[in-house]
Amino acid sequence: AAIMNGLKVAGKDMSKVKLVTSGAGAAALACVGLLVKLGIPRENVWVTDLAGVVYEGRVELMDPDKSIYAQKTDARKLGEVIDNADVFLGLSAGGVLKAEMVKRMAPNPIIFALANPTPEITPGEVKSVRDDAIIGTGRSDYPNQINNILCFPYIFRGALDAGATTITVEMEMAAVHTIAELAQ
């Protein structure tokens, strides 16, 4: 929902953006999977993790879920794939996104640095090099907190009320669209 609304504010088309994520665990891959279903082309998604860029032929720290996003590239590090990125989605570790990398992102970049307790980059670090960036973190003491607490209780309440035994992708997408609409 936050990325959908951020793209509206930035005047960007979801089908044309380049997304770079730092983190390839369950949270990151679930987010990326949903963003692809919402309209970001899979070929525009660049996933990085502790071993670097998820690329075709990589064996270190790979699994079938990551392999879906493997790119044909010689790039091996986050700093090599961040150029012209419209969206950075951080679900990894503090300090991995550097100000010099932010400088190389596309105009009006969306930077969601969600690692806790230390985000991938702080709002102050972003603002020191870009005044056109939209930044959110997972912390309540910084502006623009992004927190999954907005959706979990209500998805479960809706599932219980409907007698559902599974949370489906359709339910997740409905939650995304509803939260995006409410947060505009």
Which residues does each PLM region occupy?
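Functionally constrained cores in energy, signaling, and assembly domains
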Residues: 21-22, 42-43, 48, 52, ...
